[in-house]
Amino acid sequence: MAVLSCKGNQKSSLSIILTIFVLGFRRAAINTSSPMKILIDNGHGIQTKGKRSPDGKLLEYAYTRELARQIVKILKSRGYDSELLVPKDDDIPLSERVRRTNAHCQALGKSNVILISLHLNAAGDGTKWMNATGWSCYTCKGQTESDRLADCLYKAAEQILKNQVIRTDYARDGDADWEENFYILRHSLCPAVLTENFFMDSLRDRDFLMSQIGKKGIVDTHIKGILNYISFFFAIPH
């Protein structure tokens, strides 16, 4: 039987106390009496010019809405409070998307809401095929809670999209996500990220996106990343 010294017990006790304090602090930042609201945004709309593959077979507004609906459906089936930020096909202005997001933040508390905006990437103007490829996730500039959400999504992508290119930007601030002051990220009060789910003007990515394996991989990546983020605070198994 191992015997700990008094000094060892003191260190162990201190470690336990610090752990409890940190977990308590994290959870205090979230109103646990109110469920986490998971908002899923889908890029652009039916009226948005361009935003398609060069052959016209892949439309960003339609594709992101298809996957967003699947993500919300799966989350709801597992008992989570999730909804589409833009349920219709119309291209809702960014200011209105932010207004809807922040209305939830004001009602529930900004720490009880997260926003994930789904998009497809493009390297050119949509008239010809390009060579860029891969999945990536964006946050606004600076260190915020959005970085933790992005980290959870990146870890999920690395596990699920194993044979695909995962685009990272560790050089800027030491974490994987890319940083841009996109309007919806900069003005949303809650943790918010924007995922660029491969390139619609890459033949390689276009074929993957349109495959059932590709669609499932992207949906599963978002589900796993979101649930990993929520479980970090609430210790909810998934």
Task: Cite the ranges covered by each PLM segment.
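Active-site histidine-acidic residue metal-binding/catalytic motifs
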Residues: I30-R100, G124-D125, N131-T133
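Active-site-adjacent mobile loop/cap segments within catalytic or ligand-binding domains
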Residues: L39, R52, L58, S117, ...
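Extracytoplasmic/secreted envelope proteins and their assembly/folding machinery
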Residues: A68, V72, S95-V98, G134, ...
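Mature extracellular/periplasmic domains of secretome proteins
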Residues: R97-S111, F182-H187
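Solvent-exposed loop/turn segments at secondary-structure junctions
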Residues: G45-I46, K88-I92, L120-G126, G142-E145, ...
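Active-site-adjacent substrate-binding region
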Residues: S146-G174
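Structural recognition of the beta-strand scaffold that forms the well-ordered cores
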Residues: K37-D41, S82-V86, V113-L118, S136-T139, ...
